[in-house]
């Protein structure tokens, strides 16, 4: 049952504020003061969520964030399928991040596509003392020999590379010239940079600008035959096929997708992007930088879209169509009408089973708000949400378009805080990452992994909404929960038995 149906908004707000104070009591005074700035209760009418964000995590806490290398290699560059991405530094960073994201792609692995392969080398202490450029040259030569159909290479720097000052830019230029002008992109994404993976996104965007788009501009040759309806999908990483289910809708409404990146993206699509008429941006946090650059440099407008759940899909299709003529606007309405029977069937089947169920979210820099509409389409209520690496403009978007009055907001929440919030608010479902998954399942509550869809998906588009609804129902209403109870539900049952 929805909390709002049994408590007034004022009561919910007061309860959540009291909960925040209770959680902060365990900290030393200075730490409590710092963490208090990241925890708040949303108040309707405010322009943002009232929390500080994009600030260094407190040393010693179990933060859930990643590093700049993760943001660049793991998020932005890694899914570009026809380029080889080198983890430049000690073996651990590449090994322990290998295959952690489900970036689907079309191609033959090891021949013309390399997403699920890991390229690194035996970087040792002597390389830190004497420099790693010689080994970098060697691995570049080996890649050229072993994988001759690669269309480009990126060098993703790990922490030691920035500390010892290896000149990866000079190596990149020299080897590019040696290989006949092959695209080789040095990326200064050392993990110590910034406060989270967010700076890695920005660094990766800047590398696209400096080493891809600037070269395309200098070349001056057209990459595609232009049409009035050319668009690019940016910031969809094709987790479980998300970008494909989004692309279907755009093409059905009459648009031509000339570039899709990073998920299932290629170097040729990156180069063609500068000739599009509109950039359609999914993950604002990781790709707004390059979208803004293309608007300033090439005059290409951009707009955000959200294809989670039918309400937001329809809203986004109409927003995108607004940049084009009546043909595309009519196409958008036609697509919405076409899929309405599917939407009706999904809601008729799953909403009665999920109505009033409560959810708490904690994801990266986008989904903590984007998926809220899909839950609401199923009659569910998000009672708490926050970002690992969101910025203030993310919380502004969250406050203005997604969360309700009284929602608990938690930025850069650590393991202790998140567990206490869940214990007290007792949601029917928690949606977060792989590090949190088993903690909450062991606590006896349903959980969905909202970074990679728990090996399901896609969740984007109308087809994805059906899968999303099925997965949420499967998590919450699984028969296994009849065999075990969350501690707070056991306590409630004991109280009822005592009262009888």
Curated annotation (Swiss-Prot):
Keywords, alphabetical: ATP-binding, Iron, Iron-sulfur, Metal-binding, Molybdenum, Nitrogen fixation, Nucleotide-binding, Oxidoreductase
Gene3D superfamilies xrefs: Nitrogenase molybdenum iron protein domain (3.40.50.1980)
Chain positions recorded as [8Fe-7S] cluster binding sites: 67, 93, 159
Matching PROSITE patterns: NITROGENASE_1_1, NITROGENASE_1_2
Pfam families from the UniProt entry: Oxidored_nitro
Catalyzed reactions: N2 + 8 reduced [2Fe-2S]-[ferredoxin] + 16 ATP + 16 H2O = H2 + 8 oxidized [2Fe-2S]-[ferredoxin] + 2 NH4(+) + 16 ADP + 16 phosphate + 6 H(+)
Residues making up the signal peptide according to the UniProt record: none
GO biological processes: nitrogen fixation
UniProt family annotation: Belongs to the NifD/NifK/NifE/NifN family.
NCBIfam families: N2-ase-Ialpha, nifD
Subunit structure: Tetramer of two alpha and two beta chains. Forms complex with the iron protein (nitrogenase component 2).
Protein name: Nitrogenase molybdenum-iron protein alpha chain
Species assigned in the record: Rhizobium sp. cowpea (strain IRc78)
Lineage: Bacteria, Pseudomonadati, Pseudomonadota, Alphaproteobacteria, Hyphomicrobiales
Annotated gene: nifD
């Amino acid at each position: 049952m929805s909390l709002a149906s049994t408590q007034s908004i004022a009561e919910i707000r007061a309860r959540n504020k009291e909960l925040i104070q209770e959680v902060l009591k365990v900290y030393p005074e200075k730490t409590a003061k710092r963490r208090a700035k990241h925890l708040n209760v949303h108040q309707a009418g405010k322009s943002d969520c009232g929390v500080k964000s994009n600030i260094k995590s407190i040393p010693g806490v179990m933060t859930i964030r990643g590093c700049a290398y993760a943001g660049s290699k793991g998020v932005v560059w890694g899914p570009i399928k026809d380029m080889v991405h080198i983890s430049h530094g000690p073996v651990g960073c590449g090994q322990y991040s290998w295959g952690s994201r489900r970036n689907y792609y079309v191609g033959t692995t090891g021949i013309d596509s390399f997403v699920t392969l890991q390229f690194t080398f035996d970087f040792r202490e002597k390389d830190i003392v004497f420099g790693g450029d010689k080994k970098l040259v060697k691995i570049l030569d080996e890649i050229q020999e072993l994988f001759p159909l690669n269309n480009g290479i990126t060098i993703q720097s790990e922490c030691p590379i920035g500390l010892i000052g290896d000149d990866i830019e000079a190596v990149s230029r020299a080897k590019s010239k040696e290989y006949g002008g092959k695209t080789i992109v040095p990326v200064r994404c050392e993990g110590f940079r910034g406060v989270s993976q967010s700076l890695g996104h920005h660094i990766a965007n800047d590398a696209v600008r400096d080493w891809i788009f600037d070269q395309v501009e200098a070349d001056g040759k057209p990459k595609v035959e232009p049409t009035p309806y050319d668009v690019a999908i940016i910031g969809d990483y094709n987790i479980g096929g998300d970008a494909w289910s989004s692309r279907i809708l755009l093409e059905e409404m009459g648009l031509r997708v000339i570039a899709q990146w990073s998920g299932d993206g290629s170097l040729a699509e990156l180069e063609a992007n500068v000739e599009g008429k509109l950039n359609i941006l999914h993950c604002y946090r990781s790709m707004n930088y390059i979208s803004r650059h293309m608007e300033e440099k090439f005059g290409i407008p951009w707009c955000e879209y959200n294809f989670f759940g039918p309400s937001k899909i329809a809203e986004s299709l109409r927003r995108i169509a607004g940049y084009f003529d009546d043909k595309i606007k009519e196409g958008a309405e036609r697509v919405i009408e076409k899929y309405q029977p599917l939407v009706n069937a999904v809601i008729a089947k799953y909403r009665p089973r999920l109505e009033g169920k409560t959810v708490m979210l904690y994801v990266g820099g986008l989904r903590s708000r984007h998926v809220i509409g899909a839950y609401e389409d199923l009659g569910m209520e998000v009672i708490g949400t926050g970002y690992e690496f969101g910025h203030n403009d993310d919380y502004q978007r969250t406050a203005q378009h997604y969360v309700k009055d009284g929602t608990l907001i938690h930025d850069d929440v650590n393991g202790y805080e998140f567990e206490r919030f869940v214990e007290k608010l007792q949601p029917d479902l928690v949606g977060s990452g792989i590090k949190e998954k088993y903690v909450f399942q062991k606590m006896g509550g349903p959980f969905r992994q909202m970074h990679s869809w728990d090996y399901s998906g896609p969740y984007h588009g109308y087809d994805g909404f059906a899968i999303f609804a099925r997965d949420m129902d499967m998590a919450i209403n699984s028969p296994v929960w009849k065999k075990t109870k969350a501690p707070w539900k056991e306590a409630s049952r004991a109280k009822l038995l005592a009262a009888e």
